[in-house]
Amino acid sequence: MTEPDSGAATRAERTPTLPTLLRCCAALAATPGRLLRPRRPDTALLANLEVLPPPAASAAVRLTVLTQATMSAPTTIVAEGVRSLKHMRLSMAAFLVEHPKARFLIDPALCAGVHERVLPELPFPVPLLVAPDKPVLGLSDALAAHDIAGEDIDFVIPTHLHWDHVSGLLELPASVEIRLPGVEYDWAMGGPHAPAGVARGPLRGRGFDRVELDGPPVLTFSRSKDLFGDGSVLLVDLAGHTPGSIGVLLAVDDGSRVLFAGDAVWSKLQVDLLREKAPMPGKLFDADRDAAFTTIHRLHALPDGIELVASHDYAAVTARAAK
């Protein structure tokens, strides 16, 4: 059953069209030059990154990938400086995590009818740039395929609050809490207008638990949070794409360590080549380009044995789903 859309009140909070169009034009104008001369890696930063092992995990989680939609984008805008006419397939997915003490979702991504229910909240021309291909598998149907109902979910952890990581909340009970850093909530929900990639409708009426990253450095990341105190679910700081972007490092019951990196990158190609997104779309959707590039360096320096899954990396998401 399709619910009504998130309403005119939330659409009124979107950024006006003219400023968005001006940002798009500026980003487009900057893109050709960065195709020829991509941003150089910070070799000093790489040389000074310390790699600290994560704590030993005394518990493990079961992980299920819920692929909901796909889309495609030119490879040359996903990783600037890559001179290719090819398109890269991108995924949109939620991730079900079952811990001995809780069942939760990383990135409750999409609801059924997201094109009509959520995308109208975004300023023009953003919906034209980000809309997934149809059909879209709604979150409740994706969960039902694994015999799980929305009422079975204890809480959700969005890697950040862009629309395509939280729209599935419209299909979860209002009692399901959102856990995330307070700085992310303040950025997305403060002020008269939502940031360009944020739709506030799915977030309205929700309980938020502000989880601060007050734990020690882990791997190449400066701050962490051991969610259950057993090393199985660690939140790490991936600020840049948004002010409160986080990664979720899991100790999975197949023996692997999986890091969900949200939109810190859209593809592992960026990590391998140390490339940020092209100015279009990076200048439109990355809140702090310098911080985002620093985060890519931290991902590049990860040790072997960490499986990196960016939310839109179709190859990585599909490979994890097959395990």
What are the residue ranges of the model-derived segments?
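Active-site environment of divalent metal-dependent phosphoester hydrolases
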Residues: V51, S72, L161-S167, P243-I246, ...
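Metallo-beta-lactamase
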Residues: T2-D152, P181-D237, S256-G262, L284-G305
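C-terminal/domain-terminus segments
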Residues: G81-V82, R179-L180, M189-G207, L269-D272, ...
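Active-site metal-binding loops of divalent metal-dependent hydrolases
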Residues: A69, P108-C111, L161, E184, ...
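Cap/insert and terminal regions of metallo-dependent hydrolase folds
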Residues: T2-E3, P127-D141, D254-K323
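Active-site metal-binding motif and surrounding structural segment of the metallo-beta-lactamase
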Residues: V118-R179
